[in-house]
Amino acid sequence: MEIKKFEIGQKTLRTDTQIVVISFFRFKGIFQKIWAFGQMGFARKKLKNIKEISFYKLFGSGTGEGFTPYPNTSVYAILSVWNDINIAEKSIREKEIYEKYRAKSVENWNVFLSPISSKGYWDKINPFDPLKKEAVSEEKMLAALTRATIKPKIMLKFWSRVPAISKVIGNDKNVLFKMGLGEIPWFHQVTFSIWPNAEAMSNFARKEGPHAKAIKSVREGNWFSEELYARFKVEKAIGKWCGKSVI
């Protein structure tokens, strides 16, 4: 089997079994929230020094389920890309930076994902290496991630559309989990959702309404300076969110 490699900085990792992990953390108390906010800068070096990680991102979130321009000082997340699910799980359990996040937070949830498809760029690269199509069942639980750098002149127009889209997602009984995240408030945005199968995900994407209209406006108005759309097979999850097992 041909082994593909992905390079970032000085790191070169096998990605034949690439795993993407999104770790969510909820904080309570002013000092814990201040610590979490500070880690948006300070945790970068710690994550960069973990040689098994080929790509990472730190996120804040919006109020509610994250799909608002108003920051939620309680919820933060880390996205990390690994070359093996066992290495990822062991590292997240044992590495100091993850231990500190767990110690400071009141709850945390980690979802392990295998890329199925990925189109576009994130900081001028595509960090996700998809599985072969035959390795994915249409009936398996899937996740969708979209990220975009919003052009400054479009920011107000973009955020005026978000409440209607958020309401549609929230009312969809098929969505198992959804969260809006941000690298840089208002400008670098990420949406993440989990669906029971490919059909449910596709039905939402094709449905007429605010979501479809927003996509049309994005394409016609060239709203984003950079964007990426990815789908994943959900492999497993560890921890709880809102006091319960999500999937």
Feature map (PLM): residue ranges:
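Short beta-strand-to-loop acidic/aromatic patch adjacent to the donor-nucleotide binding site
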Residues: 79
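Short S/T/G/P-rich N-terminal loop/turn motif that feeds into the first structured element of a domain
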Residues: 1-76, 85-91, 104-190, 200-209, ...
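C-terminal end-helix/capping segment
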Residues: 215-221
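An exposed tryptophan-centered "aromatic clamp" motif
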Residues: 224
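A common structural junction motif
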Residues: 96-103, 212-213
